Amino acid sequence: MSVTLPVSVGEALDKLTILDIKCDKIQDERRADCVLERDTLLKDLKSYIDQFPWHYKILKEVNLTIWNLQDNFHGKDITEIRAGQICTEILKENDRRFRVKAKINNLLSSKLREQKGYAKKKAFFYGHLGLGDMFWMCGAVRYLATCYDQVVVVCKNKYLRNVQQMYADDPTIILFPIVDDYIIQPFQSAAKPNIESNLGMTVYACGYHTTNPRIYEFPLSFYDDLKLDRSIRTEYFYVPTTDV
C-alpha cells in the first residue's frame, strides 16, 4: 500500500537524490527496494531534473556528503571530539541542503515551502570588479549562497545588468553596485570591520582586497584567499538560461 502526500518539488527532488545515492551505495538484497522507490518517483520528477539539472546535481552532492559523514560516524570507533566535529559538519550540510531545496521551490513559486527556525546568516563578498572576474568567481558566490541565507556581492555599476542576469535565478544573492573600488576603501581597515560589526555579516575578500595580497595561478589564488576548495570554481559555476 502507498499514500500520496502533497510536497514541494524541492522536497521531492531531495528524496530522489537520496534514493539515487542508496542505489549506488547499497549492493545487497535491499537495493531492489531502493530501485523500485527511485524509479517510481522518477516517473513524476524527470521533467524537473531536466529543468533544474544544476540544482539537482548540487542537492545530490550535499546529500552524498551527509551520507559519507554519517558513514564515518555509525559503528566507528572515534573519539568524542571527532564525533562532535562530524555532528557539526552534518548540521552545516543539512542547512546547505535546506537552502538548495528553497532555491528550487522559489524558482517554481511553490506554495509549500520548508522553513527553519535559526537566525539567518549573511555574507559579504568583495572580489575584483572586472566583468571577467565576476565570471571567474561565480562558482564561489554560488557556493556561498548555499552556506548563507543571503550573500551580498560588490559589482561595478556599469556591469550591473550583466551580473544581475548571472544570478537572476537566486534572490538570496544581492548585488551592491558601486562606481569603483575607491567607494569602499580602505577595505580591510575600515569597511570590513564596519560590515562585520554593524551589519553582522561574514566578509569574504580575495585578491588585492586581502590583507597581504598575492596573485598566483590566476584565478585559483582567489579561491585560496577565500579558503574554498579550488574545484568549487567549476563545480558550482552556473549561469541561468535567459528567456528568448
Language-model regions: role of each:
Residues 1-120:
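Anionic, Ser/Thr-rich low-complexity intrinsically disordered regions
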Residues 120-244:
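Catalytic machinery of carbohydrate-active enzymes
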